[in-house]
Design a protein with these regions (language model features):
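Conserved phosphate- and dinucleotide-binding cores of soluble alpha/beta proteins
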Residues: 1-138
């Protein structure tokens, strides 16, 4: 979670000792991490069926340096279920409001100037499944 392009938080190809080093890494071929393979198996090009064997095990991707030098950027967080809920809500909020870090690569977009549009499915408040936590506390 928190990847952009195929810059995954636990990818061996994008390991760096510091944020400064991370931001200098360019494009490369990556080996997909298991969570990304599972997520991508849910999309149309892979049959939207959860068939992880239909997902290519490697990807050609831009690097953090390319993200930072891009003139314009589009990062979409609009995948919603039929009821309007979204499995992307937590990671989207980490990217928008959490620390800028290598552990959430897409958070580096916040280092750039630009506009961010967030779908209603992502923006709506979290509800709590636990009685002791009020929605206002989340």
């Amino acid at each position: 979670p928190g990847h952009t392009a195929f810059i995954d938080p636990c990818s061996e190809e994008f390991k760096a000792a510091s944020m400064e080093e991370f931001l200098q890494l360019g494009s490369r071929i990556t080996t997909e991490v298991p969570l990304t393979v599972c997520e991508n198996s849910l999309f149309g090009p892979m049959g939207a069926s959860g068939d992880v064997w239909a997902v290519p095990p490697k990807s050609a991707t831009i690097g953090p340096r390319d993200v930072m030098h891009a003139k314009e950027v589009v990062e979409l967080h609009n995948f919603a279920n039929a009821d309007g809920s979204s499995w992307q809500r937590m990671v989207s909020r980490l990217e928008l409001y959490g620390p800028i870090s290598m552990e959430c690569p897409a958070s580096i977009y916040r280092l750039k100037k630009g506009v961010c549009y967030v779908s209603e499915a992502i923006a709506k408040p979290f509800g709590s499944w636990y009685n002791g936590i009020a929605d206002k506390d989340i």
